[in-house]
Amino acid sequence: MDILIWIIWAGTYLLGAVRFELYIVHMFQQNSYKPKEYWEWLQVTGNIGRLLGKTLYAFISLPLLLLGGRGCMAAACLLNIMTILVNKPRHAKKPLVYTARVKRMLVTTGILFAVAAAVSAVSANVISAAAFPMDIMGKTCAFVLSVLFVLLPVVVFPVNLINHPIEQGINRHYINDAARILKEMPNLTVIGVTG
């Protein structure tokens, strides 16, 4: 029964995290994928409060989960369901466009979460080899993932930094492709090339 509650907690947590991450990536996209503009958007009055509100239930579910007991774990699952509802996508004038860049950002974020969970599980197991590892590993992973959940608005920065070489390579490919096409037309008079 406890395993089932852990699975439900993890599933509801992940769905809430994915919905919140989609909102964050949408805002990053609205700011033209520019970290400086996105940072300025974060600092606008009300945005931090709104973002914290979107993470509040997931963050409150953590102490309940760490306390243990079926009642606390069930309450933690209910709070995660509230997180899912709070992060329900709203109608936007300009909705999130699932470009290849957005997909790469989502995959990179998922990999960061998986690495953080794996590292926390392994370190918890190494530190407390005498204890029941599943309980300690699960709680440690839950703690690390909950902290990451709250930090998602700023996790965009390292994700963007990790993906930056890929994005530059893609941009370089298109520039080189345009230069090649122009070279194939020797009689063409080039006045200017725009984006």
Residue ranges and their predicted role:
Residues 5-192:
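Short, basic phosphate-binding NTP loop
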Residues 195:
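The Walker A (P-loop) glycine that initiates the GxxxxGKT/S ATP-binding motif of P-loop NTPases
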